[in-house]
Amino acid sequence: MSPQTETKAGVGFKAGVKEYKLTYYTPEYETKDTDILAAFRVTPQPGVPPEERGAAVAAESSTGTWTTVWTDGLTSLDRYKGRCYHIEPVPGEEDQFIAYVAYPLDLFEEGSVTNMFTSIVGNVFGFKALRALRLEDLRIPVAYVKTFQGPPHGIQVERDKLNKYGRPLLGCTIKPKLGLSAKNYGRAVYECLRGGLDFTKDDENVNSQPFMRWRDRFLFCAEAIYKSQAETGEIKGHYLNATAGTCEEMIKRAVFARELGVPIVMHDYLTGGFTANTSLSHYCRDNGLLLHIHRAMHAVIDRQKNHGMHFRVLAKALRMSGGDHIHSGTVVGKLEGERDITLGFVDLLRDDYIEKDRSRGIYFTQDWVSLPGVLPVASRGIHVWHMPALTEIFGDDSVLQFGGGTLGHPWGNAPGAVANRVALEACVKARNEGRDLAAEGGEIIREACKWSP
């Protein structure tokens, strides 16, 4: 071997497995305004120190691997590595802790939720040194927020388009969700809109099945919209689900909706994917369409307490990717603690600036600067007797989305819609007059029934 190519044992670095905390646990680190901050709930394997597990999360979700590699010398790890900068125990849990990780902004592609999630949660959740891992919250820095378009239009522009102010918007999901012909589907849409609803909705799994192809559904729903608008003098809409097997097909359906002149389309953003959702959001802004977002599949990700991601993270990601509405669930009949947590991420959807508040599950102060807000959609098992609570809890900037609570009315679809509208207007009027909706809600609804046709 020539002297030029001879490898000397004393040259290079010491290979082998090294503790992550030696490089990635930095409690002295002061976070920067440009860092993306993450709060992970960590459940480690027995016998592993919290500092090592927190550092492992930071390493495996940024620049690290299980050993030192020679190409580490070709870059600046101090500039690009994630850092576990704080660890705190989870109250009431002996084997869990919250690891706070800071990521330099240069690790992420501008305007890409897909890349952000691929980096932060794409690999580390399968790490065998952890029993479970949950991403509880993210702080998105202003510098990164400004690289996103966000919702196509936002709350105020939507109200201006619809010319509807001072109350929540009313919607209804057409049931049965599967099996209706396009013509019968359009009939149900017309009856609900004519009865007083602002919107009707495709169910999340209505795409283009053999019993009802998408183009037929779009045509009959557009007819229902225009007929109900002519008869009521109000602007109406139906969430036409543009979700499809390819991005190209999705955009084709959105183009057809625009050509029909309808005001809004819909997308299943988790099953459809963030890249598809961002593409559709950009199309909707460029072409004047509102965008309703359904969160189908969210419980696969957010239901487990110890593993996955909290919905507040998915809600923040949606605001960045783009959507004018998103289903947020409802707190009616739930525990008070769940109510506070739900309203925490509802505020993250609507407000420009949200202070850190751990009692509501908000781990970081979030500044959205000028990014438009998203209307939360309260849905799932609600009916007119929930209207006082829904009006009080969600306020005016929301969509109250019924299904069986409209279509299950014993007199039919249109009377069900009338009941929804009468109950809502009665509750809004009572609230504006200073009445206590929590205490007097039932009486308010019964009074309204006397005057409802």
From Swiss-Prot:
Modification type N6-carboxylysine: residues: K201
UniProt-recorded Gene Ontology molecular function terms: magnesium ion binding; monooxygenase activity; ribulose-bisphosphate carboxylase activity
Role played: RuBisCO catalyzes two reactions: the carboxylation of D-ribulose 1,5-bisphosphate, the primary event in carbon dioxide fixation, as well as the oxidative fragmentation of the pentose substrate in the photorespiration process. Both reactions occur simultaneously and in competition at the same active site.
The protein's name in its UniProt record: Ribulose bisphosphate carboxylase large chain
First-tier enzyme category under EC: lyase
Family: Belongs to the RuBisCO large chain family. Type I subfamily.
PROSITE patterns assigned: RUBISCO_LARGE (PS00157)
Site description Transition state stabilizer, residues in chain: K334
Keywords, in A-Z order: Acetylation, Calvin cycle, Carbon dioxide fixation, Chloroplast, Disulfide bond, Lyase, Magnesium, Metal-binding, Methylation, Monooxygenase, Oxidoreductase, Photorespiration, Photosynthesis, Plastid
Subunit record text: Heterohexadecamer of 8 large chains and 8 small chains; disulfide-linked. The disulfide link is formed within the large subunit homodimers.
InterPro entries: RuBisCO, RuBisCo_large_chain_AS, RuBisCO_lsu_C, RuBisCO_lsu_C_sf, RuBisCO_lsu_fd_N, RuBisCO_lsu_N_sf, RuBisCO_lsuI
Localization: Plastid, Chloroplast
Amino-acid positions noted as binding Mg(2+) in the UniProt annotation, renumbered to this chain: K201, D203, E204
Cofactor: Mg(2+)
Chain sites annotated for binding substrate: N123, T173, K177, R295, H327, S379
Residues making up the propeptide: 1-2
Main location: plastid
EC number: 4.1.1.39
Modification after translation, per record: The disulfide bond which can form in the large chain dimeric partners within the hexadecamer appears to be associated with oxidative stress and protein turnover.
